[in-house]
Amino acid sequence: MDGSGTGSRSGVESILPNYKLGRTLGIGSFGRVKIAEHALTGHKVAIKILNRRKIKNMEMEEKVRREIKILRLFMHPHIIRLYEVIETPTDIYLVMEYVNSGELFDYIVEKGRLQEDEARNFFQQIISGVEYCHRNMVVHRDLKPENLLLDSKCNVKIADFGLSNIMRDGHFLKTSCGSPNYAAPEVISGKLYAGPEVDVWSCGVILYALLCGTLPFDDENIPNLFKKIKGGIYTLPSHLSPGARDLIPRMLVVDPMKRVTIPEIRQHPWFQAHLPRYLAVPPPDTVQQAKKIDEEILQEVINMGFDRNHLIESLRNRTQNDGTVTYYLILDNRFRASSGYLGAEFQETMEGTPRMHPAESVASPVSHRLPGLMEYQGVGLRSQYPVERKWALGLQSRAHPREIMTEVLKALQDLNVCWKKIGHYNMKCRWVPNSSADGMLSNSMHDNNYFGDESSIIENEAAVKSPNVVKFEIQLYKTRDDKYLLDLQRVQGPQFLFLDLCAAFLAQLRVL
């Protein structure tokens, strides 16, 4: 027990009656972490106690809420588990998985560069966890050894989702965040990015650190560091195996559109070597996991006094209560203790459901096989590699971007749509049905005007306040096969009006 006062201790224990609190594991900027024991099962947990006032003073409410939202969703052997959230007017209590072997960062500092098999084992676990995030439309954006925790068996647990973002179809992120040494060039440059590819870059930096004991991009001078990252300037030590020397450069490609994807990493010969059975297939999504209930553990929880029907309904609906917390604590600790480390759960999914092809993973923005990957060292993967997609987001064209944008502006003018330029190939738009062109806008359609610094828009206040106003964004981006994709995303307004507008917009275009 720590030295906190009896009054505060009894207060906390009244809020957490199902746990026996132990010592303080650490103290942070807006809270502390205590070890605790779940009363019914005896399993250890870590309880984060976050002070609401400190969170608000540090303007960290959004970061904390984001992490809670994401961790509540996730069930994966290599992502830290959140079992329960208890809120009071003064504090937020997060009951989380307890891991006791520190950070991967400290492990690397202590051991230096790792043997290839050990590094590969860590990397396989990291990629599995990151792939699970992407399948659930979450980009971590701050992957680094400091955010990778180790349990007693040296299994990786991805933590700290405070900087993560939920991905939305057709929407691009532009928030620069994360640690500079691990951040992708497009992130530190403030460019638009779809998400998954920035995690791939960070994983490449982590793999380099595991195998080399140093960082590929490092400089005390931040401008020099950014210059190295933007230029992709680093050296590969001679001790690396041919497989590692092939994979790392594929991950540390400056152009995100040419960077290897998670499905392609999975199929790389170096990654495939000694791949554990439970990591050999993509993990089930959260919906599949909620439907699958372990009958033996269910009965064990029922024997503790919980109602069977209520427990099953709560598990299927992912409802947090004493019964479901008890169930998941037993489930996780049982599989963790087994030699397969959750292998049984993943194997059951593999055998009980159709195998999802790696190409179905979230990839950014359009997934295609990289040329040369299958020819590496003469290894023929045949049907294992991701098949090229038959579909893509948005409207495709091989026309020049300037020509495309000029036609877009002409179509917007014909449809009486207001637009505001955000970047050369990104704009915000507003449309009100049955509004005249004179009342809505006065746009110059000369292409030099669009590619200049001005946004050509003059609006009518009455039109802006219309209940039928439709707001949307237009984004043009380049694909790997030298085509261009034009994507429209509704931001606000009636869905059917937006679809009508899209149909009319498509009919107006001459280059797509």
Curated annotation (Swiss-Prot):
Residues 292-332 form the UBA domain. Activated by phosphorylation at Thr-175 by GRIK1/SNAK2 and GRIK2/SNAK1. Inactivated by dephosphorylation at Thr-175. Inhibited by trehalose-6-phosphate. Down-regulated by SR45 by affecting its stability. Reduced kinase activity in response to H(2)O(2) treatment. The redox-state of Cys-177 seems to directly influence its kinase activity. Down-regulated by FLZ6 and FLZ10. Its EC number is 2.7.11.1. Keywords: ATP-binding, Carbohydrate metabolism, Chloroplast, Cytoplasm, Endoplasmic reticulum, Fatty acid biosynthesis, Fatty acid metabolism, Golgi apparatus, Isopeptide bond, Kinase, Lipid biosynthesis, Lipid metabolism, Nitrate assimilation, Nucleotide-binding, Nucleus, Phosphoprotein, Plastid, Serine/threonine-protein kinase, Transferase, Ubl conjugation, Ubl conjugation pathway. Phosphorylated at Thr-175 in response to glucose. Phosphorylated at Thr-175 under submergence. Autophosphorylated. Dephosphorylated at Thr-175 by ABI1 and PP2CA. Ubiquitinated. Degradation is mediated by a CUL4-based E3 ligase that uses PRL1 as a substrate receptor. Disruption phenotype: Anthocyanin accumulation and accelerated senescence. Starch accumulation during phosphate deficiency. Reduced sensitivity to glucose during early development. Increased seed abortion. Blocked autophagy during abiotic stresses but not under control conditions. Enhanced sucrose-induced hypocotyl elongation. It catalyses: L-seryl-[protein] + ATP = O-phospho-L-seryl-[protein] + ADP + H(+); L-threonyl-[protein] + ATP = O-phospho-L-threonyl-[protein] + ADP + H(+). Residues 463-511 form the KA1 domain. Changing K34R: Abolishes sumoylation. InterPro entries: KA1/Ssp2_C, KA1_dom, Kinase-like_dom_sf, Prot_kinase_dom, Protein_kinase_ATP_BS, Ser/Thr_kinase_AS, UBA, UBA-like_sf. Induction: Induced by sucrose. Induced by DCMU herbicide. Induced by glucose. Up-regulated by beta-aminobutyric acid (BABA). Induced by hypoxia following submergence. Induced by salt and oxidative stresses (at the protein level). Belongs to the protein kinase superfamily. CAMK Ser/Thr protein kinase family. SNF1 subfamily. Overexpressing plants show delayed leaf senescence, enhanced tolerance to nutrient starvation dependent on a functional autophagy pathway, enhanced formation of autophagosomes, and tolerance to drought and submergence. Overexpression of KIN10 leads to increased autophagy. Overexpression inhibits sucrose-induced hypocotyl elongation. The regulatory domain (RD) contains the auto-inhibitory domain (AID) that inhibits kinase activity of the protein kinase domain (KD). Subunit of a probable heterotrimeric complex consisting of an alpha catalytic (KIN10 or KIN11) subunit, and a beta (KINB) and a gamma (KING or SNF4) non-catalytic regulatory subunits. Interacts with KINB2, KINB3, SNF4 and probably with KINB1 and KING1. Interacts with SKP1/ASK1, PAD1, the N-terminus of PRL1 and the WD40 domain of 5PTase13. Potential subunit of a SCF ubiquitin ligase complex consisting of a SNF1-related protein kinase, SKP1 and CUL1. The association of the SCF complex with the proteasome may be mediated by PAD1 and seems to be inhibited by the interaction with PRL1. Catalytic subunit of the probable trimeric SNF1-related protein kinase (SnRK) complex, a central regulator of cellular energy homeostasis, which, in response to seemingly unrelated darkness, sugar and stress conditions, activates energy-producing pathways and inhibits energy-consuming processes. May play a role in a signal transduction cascade regulating gene expression and carbohydrate metabolism in higher plants. This is SNF1-related protein kinase catalytic subunit alpha KIN10. The lineage of its organism: Eukaryota, Viridiplantae, Streptophyta, Embryophyta, Tracheophyta.
